UniProtKB/Swiss-Prot annotation:
Free-text function comment from the UniProt entry: Aspartyl-tRNA synthetase with relaxed tRNA specificity since it is able to aspartylate not only its cognate tRNA(Asp) but also tRNA(Asn). Reaction proceeds in two steps: L-aspartate is first activated by ATP to form Asp-AMP and then transferred to the acceptor end of tRNA(Asp/Asn).
Subunit-level organization: Homodimer.
Organism: Wolbachia sp. subsp. Brugia malayi (strain TRS)
Protein's UniProt name: Aspartate--tRNA(Asp/Asn) ligase
Residues where L-aspartate binds: 187, 233, 463, 504
Subcellular location: Cytoplasm
Enzyme Commission number, as recorded: 6.1.1.23
Name of encoding gene: aspS
Amino acid sequence: MNYYKTHTCNELRKNDVEKEVTLSGWMYRKRDHGNLIFVDLRDFYGITQLVFNNDKDFFCKISDLKPESVITVTGIVKARTEDTINISISTGEIEVTVNNLQIESEVEFHHNEETAKEERSILASIADDQEYPENMRFKYRFLDLRREKVRNNIVLRSQIIAELRKFMIEQGFLEIQTPILTASSPEGARDYLVPSRLNPGKFYALPQAPQIFKQLLMISGFDKYFQIAPCFRDEDARADRSPGEFYQLDLEMSFVTQEDVFQVIESTLYKVFAKFSRKSVDKGFSRITYKEAMLKYGSDKPDLRNPLLISDVTEIFRDSEFNIFKSNIERGMVVRAIPAPKTAEEPRSFFDKKIEHTQKEFGAKGLGYITFNKDGTAKGPIAKFLDDNRLNHIREATNIKPGDSVFFASDKENEAATIAGKVRTLLGSELGLIDNNIFKFCWVVDFPYFVYDDKSKKIDFFHNPFSMPHGGLKDLEEKNPLDILAYQYDLVCNGIELSSGAIRNNKLDIMYKAFATAGYNKEEVNKKFGALVRAFRFGVPPHGGIAPGIDRIVMLLADAPNIREITCFPMNQQGEDVLMDAPSKVDNKHLRELSLKVVE
């Protein structure tokens, strides 16, 4: 028998009346009625109401005890009267009359009055379920986690990870841990470096992903690998990205095609989303090429809940009387159109605000609009420069109806696509077109293998350098590098990228040629990826994988506004752990041991 409890605070029911029980937990709420004090005792599992009578010698103790103190009580279960039943809690038909009280740990406020005031405020937020500034919540995260909503997110996270692990094992995957201290990798973000005491002047790197290790596992003969992998990238925070570290369901398989990877992920994620969400889950995982995604949605992370589709109307404006767009087109730019249903009768301020917002927030230029009124006429700053034939072509291209409007964005192709995508998202949200009660997945496939970097003035890898190009070595030798596609794919849900993956290159000559195209010679490749190069000389199976982000999956299923809400001990947006005061300075002795010196 447990010394501290016979039951949890969510366990007692009406059929337990007159039983003697022992409960332990935190004093959640206290109500003093003079001769009686009612206490809501809370543990991890729930709440039970306690009744303290003033004829007990510990009555004064409970009267003076501060909320969130930890107590153990023994008492008799009693049925509540009909008018005092609390249907909002599962133990609401009973209460426990306390015969014995033991104070396990009493709340003590800091001696500094300013700090004590802060502590009282955060304690009050637990009882009242108030929101407090994020930094205060994170500084007192051990208190913040006592709030039901916050705790439930962490419980949900644990349950989702357990379910993912179960599905992987059921499909024959082996869970294998790969090293945390490793070498720096070219994943695209900055590494977190760890100085080596035993090797002065040398550094480990925390893994941005287990990319090379999981490929080495396939070369080693393992067939299906997975792990709940911690990944570390020195990146700025966003709503869907934590600074520093994140977790992913990392997996890799041998002798597979792209379709085999899709089948595993679609089956797994559909089951997880269907189990843990009240929203409907679209069973169809759409396939969209990268080129199509950028054209129709203005993003490689398309939100398919938004029905608006972007159209290319460059040819309609070519040689038109609207000189701004005409001039842009002559200089190699494009024009994209974004429909705005049922907005033709909106005042001019509606359109001006959208354009002003897009210019201010996204640095957009070359914006305009046309309204197509119900009587068939077209109005707006651009309409007067277009003849009826061009206006009809715009109607057809954008599939709009009388009473709709169209926004336009003109710029270089990539910039115009991005701005059009931002406008599409803005309109979808403000016009109430997005269904918030559904999860819609899509695969974005056929990414470019290479991209031209305007800053470095050179060709570089668009995504993962270890993926297989379409057409293999032949395309690398014969095609324009910017026309080569890769067997790379992203999984997107409701406009959030859940995962990236690829079918890997398994041939050494293709690896060397791909890196040569991006400006790396053999010596550089051998030095940077020595382990992989050595392994590639000893039989490499065709293999591929993917790594869905755990944090983003949980964020979506918890309907949380950002990743910090589903992380147990998160950093703030400045990459600071205000609870543990990290990052922090270290003393000179420690620095000397690591052969380091801080340069101010």
